[in-house]
A protein has these predicted regions:
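Extended, polar/charged low-complexity intrinsically disordered and coiled-coil segments in eukaryotic
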Residues: 2-264, 448, 474-478, 485-497
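Conserved alpha/beta-hydrolase
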Residues: 289, 297-317, 472
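Short alpha-helix in the alpha/beta-hydrolase fold that links the catalytic acid
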Residues: 292, 453-463, 487
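Active-site nucleophile loop of the alpha/beta-hydrolase fold
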Residues: 308, 372-382
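Catalytic histidine-centered segment of alpha/beta-hydrolase-like enzymes
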Residues: 312-318, 380, 451, 471-473, ...
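Conserved acidic catalytic loop of the alpha/beta-hydrolase fold
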Residues: 327-345
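Gly/Ala-rich beta-loop-alpha elbow adjacent to hydrolase catalytic centers
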Residues: 347-358
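Short beta-strand/loop motif that positions the catalytic acidic residue
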Residues: 437, 442-445, 449
C-alpha cells in the first residue's frame, strides 16, 4: 500500500486520545503529584488519600517517574549526537545506486522470470528509461521529501542535498570540490534526472526539506517509567518462559541468543531439519511474539533467537543506544554456527529483522541455506515508502497510531532508525539471495501493509526472476500480522519452516 495523506480516521482519533494521550500524560502528572502531595496536602489529607490504592499506585509511580524522566531527557539528548558509520566506498555506492535506478526503468519491456546478473553499468541515459518507468519513479522520489511535495517544487539543490546523503552520507557544503564524493554526487543528479525524465529547476526551494535519516533529528517521544517497567517485565517473563521450556541464554561476540537443541521428530525427514535462526522486528521485544513462539518451540529443529535490546525497549542495556554493527552481527552468527557445528541454517526474519537478514546474506551467505522473510521491509528501500511511512506520514488508522507512537517514537527504536540506518547496507537485492526456488525461499507480505508498498515489492521480485511460488501476499493483512496473529501469514511462515 502506497503512503497516503488521508485524514485521521475516527478509530485513529480514539487511539490517539485514549492510550497514547494517557501514557504521555503520566509524566506531567507525576511532576505535579509529588509536590502537591508533600507541599499542598495536610498530614490528615495525605493519610486519607494514600488509603486509596489507585492514588498510592500513582504516587509510587511518580516517585520513580520524576527522576526517570530526567534520565530519559538526558538520554534523548545524547541520542541526537551524530554517529560515525562505515559506508560503502564510491565505486560500490555507484554500482548500488545505478542498480537501484535500473529497477523498473523499462516497464513496457519488463522481462519477468529471469534472474539478472550483477549490473556492470557505469552510467544511466534517458533512453534507457521508458515513460511508464519514469512516471512511477517520479511518484516514489517525492517520498524522500517531507510532505511529499510535487516534483516541480523540488529544485536542483534540494535534489542534490538528498543525493549527497544517499550516495556519500554528506552535506553538499561539506563535500570537497573534485573529490570522488563530489564526482559521484554530480553523476547521481544527472542519472536521477534521466530516471525521472525531469530536469530540476535551478536553485533551492527553502520550503522543501529532504529526508536524511542519519542527519535529521532523532524523532523520539517521551514515555513514563511505567511503560518501560511493563515492557521489560513482559520481555523478562518471556525469557523465563523460554528458559523453562528447554532453552538457554548464550552470547557469541557482541550478540546474545536464546537457543535450544534439536527435538527429534520422526515426521521431520527433509531439509526442514536445518537449524532455525529467528530475527525479530521492532516493538517491545519477544513478548509480542508469544503466540508465534509457542508454535515455534514445537519445531523439532534446533532454534536460535537473536536478542536485540536496541529495538526491544531495554533502556538500561548497554546495547540500547550502541547496537552491534553489521560486521559484529555476521561474526557472531558465524561463531555460534561454528560452535554448534551448523553448516547451514534456515533464517526466519520479521519486519526490521529482514534488514539484519540482509547483512547475514551478504556476510555469511554459505550459512543461509533457506530464507523466510515475513513482512519484509528490506526490498526496494530506495523508493522511500518504508522511511516516509514509518517516520513522516501523518497517522490515519488505529494501527498507524500504535506503531507510530509506541514503536517508531520509542527512543531505542528511533535511534536505531535515525543513527544506525545505512539504506544501501540494509537494502536486500535479489542477487543477495543464494537460491530462489520455493524450497529455499519464501517471502510473506501483507496486502494492506502501510509501511511497505507490497505491489511494488512483488513487481520487483517478479522482474528479478522470483516466481509466485516463493511469494505470498496475505489478503486483507496489515503489517506485523504474519508473526503476531495466528492467521494465514503465520501459518504460511510455520509451514515454510
Amino acid at each position: 500500500m502506497a503512503p497516503s495523506d488521508a485524514p485521521l480516521s475516527f478509530g485513529g482519533r480514539v487511539t490517539l486520545i485514549v492510550p497514547t494521550a494517557l501514557v504521555w500524560a503520566l509524566t506531567p502528572l507525576s511532576w505535579v503529584l509529588v509536590p502537591y502531595h508533600h507541599l499542598v496536602l495536610s498530614d490528615s489529607q495525605r493519610v486519607a488519600w494514600t488509603s486509596r490504592y489507585w492514588y498510592l499506585f500513582l504516587l509510587y509511580h511518580a516517585y520513580l517517574d520524576v527522576p526517570f524522566s530526567v534520565f530519559l531527557f538526558w538520554l534523548t539528548k545524547k541520542a541526537q549526537r551524530p554517529k560515525e558509520l562505515v559506508h560503502p566506498g564510491p565505486d560500490e555506492m555507484r554500482r548500488i545506486f545505478l542498480e537501484c535506478l535500473e529497477v523498473g526503468a523499462k516497464l513496457k519491456e519488463r522481462q519477468v522470470g529471469i534472474r539478472k546478473p550483477r549490473t556492470t553499468k557505469t552510467s544511466l541515459t534517458k533512453e534507457e528509461v521508458d515513460e511508464m518507468g519514469a512516471e512511477v519513479m517520479r511518484l516514489k522520489f517525492r517520498q524522500w521529501f517531507r510532505g511529499r511535495p510535487p516534483l516541480s517544487e523540488i529544485y536542483r539543490a534540494n535534489a542534490i542535498e538528498w543525493i549527497a546523503w544517499a550516495v556519500a552520507d554528506a552535506r553538499p557544503e561539506d563535500v570537497v570540490s573534485g573529490s570522488e564524493a563530489d564526482i559521484l554526487i554530480n553523476e547521481g543528479i544527472e542519472w536521477m534526472q534521466h530516471r525521472l525524465h525531469h530536469d530540476f529547476t535551478p536553485g533551492r526551494n527553502p520550503k522543501v526539506e529532504s529526508i536524511r535519516l542519519t542527519m535529521d533529528p532523532v524523532r523520539a517521544a517521551h514515555r513514563p517509567v511505567g511503560y518501560y517497567i511493563v515492557c521489560n517485565s513482559v520481555t523478562l517473563l518471556t525469557y523465563a518462559w523460554l528458559l523453562t521450556n528447554g532453552c538457554r541464554y548464550e552470547r557469541y561476540g557482541e550478540c546474545a541468543y536464546i537457543t535450544r537443541g534439536a527435538r527429534p521428530d520422526k515426521r521431520s525427514k527433509t531439509s526442514a531439519g536445518l537449524p532455525i535462526l529467528f530475527v525479530h522486528g521492532l516493538g517491545i521485544g519477544l513478548g509480542q511474539y508469544l503466540d508465534f513462539l509457542r508454535r515455534f518451540l514445537a519445531q523439532p529443529q534446533p532454534i536460535m533467537i537473536l536478542i536485540q535490546p536496541n529495538i526491544s525497549t531495554q533502556i538500561f542495556h548497554r546495547h540500547f543506544l550502541h547496537p552491534p554493527s553489521k560486521d559484529e552481527h555476521v561474526a557472531s552468527f558465524k561463531a555460534i554456527c561454528a560452535a554448534k557445528g551448523y553448516t547451514g541454517c534456515t533464517i526466519l526474519s520479521h519486519s526490521n529483522g529482514t534488514m539484519v537478514h540482509a547483512w547475514l546474506l551478504r556476510g555469511a551467505k554459505e550459512l543461509c541455506r533457506r530464507n523466510v522473510l515475513a513482512d519484509a521491509v528490506s526490498f526496494c528501500l530506495w523508493q522511500g515508502d518504508v522511511c516516509y511511512s514509518f517516520l513522516h506520514q501523518p497517522w490515519r488508522e488505529t494501527m498507524e497510531v500504535l506503531l507510530g507512537y509506541f514503536v517508531a517514537r520509542e527512543l531505542g527504536t528511533a535511534h536505531t532508525i535515525c543513527r544506525n540506518f545505512i539504506w544501501s547496507d540494509m537494502l536486500l537485492m535479489e542477487r543477495d539471495l543464494p537460491r530462489t526456488d520455493p524450497a529455499s525461499l519464501q517471502i510473506i507480505l501483507a496486502e494492506h501493509d502501510f509501511l511497505v508498498d507490497a505491489d511494488a515489492v512483488v513487481a520487483y521480485l517478479h522482474e528479478s526472476g522470483i516466481s509466485d511460488d516463493c511469494i505470498t501476499c496475505v489478503k486483507g493483512a496489515q503489517h506485523g500480522a504474519a508473526l503476531i496473529v495466528h492467521e494465514e501469514g503465520m501459518k504460511k511462515v510455520l509451514a515454510s519452516l
